[in-house]
């Protein structure tokens, strides 16, 4: 079995930091119709520059949704 090439690992890490990865999770546990536990998580792996860029865009989307909801 061939060993993984360290340069390809560095390329993958560079790409992840450049583009970022977001894992958005929502889980609810209920027993007999009674909600016992709710877990909501958003995990972001990115460079600071990438995160700040996308955080600004997400804030714009959320603000537009709030404005549209207030007008309705």
From Swiss-Prot:
GO terms for cellular component: gas vesicle shell; vesicle membrane. Keywords: Gas vesicle. The keyword Iron does not apply. GO terms for molecular function: structural molecule activity. It is found in: Gas vesicle shell. PANTHER family: GAS VESICLE PROTEIN A1, GAS VESICLE STRUCTURAL PROTEIN 2-RELATED. Gas vesicles are hollow, gas filled proteinaceous nanostructures found in some microorganisms. During planktonic growth they allow positioning of the organism at a favorable depth for light or nutrient acquisition. GvpA forms the protein shell. The gas vesicle shell is 2 nm thick and consists of a single layer of this protein. It forms helical ribs nearly perpendicular to the long axis of the vesicle. Belongs to the gas vesicle GvpA family. Gas vesicles are about 100 nm wide and 200-400 nm long, and located close to the cell surface. This is Gas vesicle protein A.
């Amino acid at each position: 079995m061939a060993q993984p090439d360290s340069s390809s690992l560095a390329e993958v890490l560079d790409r992840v930091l450049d583009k970022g990865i977001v894992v958005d999770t929502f889980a609810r546990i209920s027993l007999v119709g009674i909600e016992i536990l709710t877990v909501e998580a958003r995990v972001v792996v990115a460079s600071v520059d990438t995160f700040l860029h996308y955080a600004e865009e997400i804030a714009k989307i959320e603000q537009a949704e709030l404005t549209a909801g207030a007008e309705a």
